Amino acid sequence: YLLIILGLLLGKLNSKAISPFYTNHTNFKQLTIQDGLKDNTVLSIHKDSKGIMWLGTSTGLSKYDGNHFTNYTLDQYFSMNVRKIEEDSRHILYLQTNDWITYMDCKDENTGRLHTLVKNKDYQVTDFLLLNDSTLFACDNQTLSSFRIMLDQNGHPFSKLEKVYPFEMAKGERFMKFCITNNHRKIYLVTNSARVLLLEISTGRVLKQKRLLTTKHEFGASSVVCHNGKLFISSMLHGIFIMDTSLENLSHIANQQNIFPTHLSHNDVYNIIPISDSSILATTWYGYTMLLADNNIPGGWTTEIRTSEPTWQSLNFEARMISSYYDPHGFLWIGTHGGGVLVSDWKWNFIKQYQRRQCSRKHHY
């Protein structure tokens, strides 16, 4: 009966009722260049449809099958940092490398540059998103563009410009990150001056916009996620901003210096990912923070900060965490600056906590 109960509970890891994060210490395994990783600075992480892990580093791409690494330089002339990885249904990876897009066909491991041309010039990509096998959105400093993806006679992708969305931008203002709504009808774009724009794809109209804060300096948008009716925006200077998808009811979570307790491990937030309907993980320059929906306050959030774990001390690295990936099967991957990648099996943490609760109840009885 215990195994049946545990199976049912583990099946709910992503449900609203149960968060897979717990206050007990979490064990991590570290993988570095000594294990075969191409570089110890890991900028992006992706698990493909075959179960293979792909790690984008500051000098190229690494493939990890659970036992061994295979490394790819991607270009014979340039040192390629891989900041984002997306995959289509044909097992083709699209990589944000420097300021352009590179593809990797996993079937034959052929790589090449996906030329995204606007007015016969290569698009200077600051962010991109693969909508489906045939449509890719990308933004540069001033515009958003959609490209049609097709395959050549060898089955490798190439692109053709479909539409350019122009915007009125202030002097020095530029786009940094964007995301798309679940129904694929609208896009949220974030600029370096902390402005958020809500764009309707079919008409190209800006439906709404909001200023997150007033600043004369760079906002430093690092990621934007639309999840469970909320929009999450992280900044490498100002922490995390949360609001409704209508751009209303703004909340700001930050590290309050010299104030205890604080709400964030560090204001330099490099990445945010959903863990469940009610929990978000933020990786920062100093550890990571879990954001948990507050059951007592509608629309409220509580945070749990991790800046030190027993296993981190034995791994001998600084907790500079800059990327993350959560596998729904229970594995958390965190990329670091200079410390390789950390891996933790969170489902076993859940089982151990469940067993402790059962023992506690028996003792109470």
List PLM regions with ranges.
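Carboxylate-rich, polar loop motifs that coordinate divalent cations or form catalytic acidic clusters
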Residues: 1-365
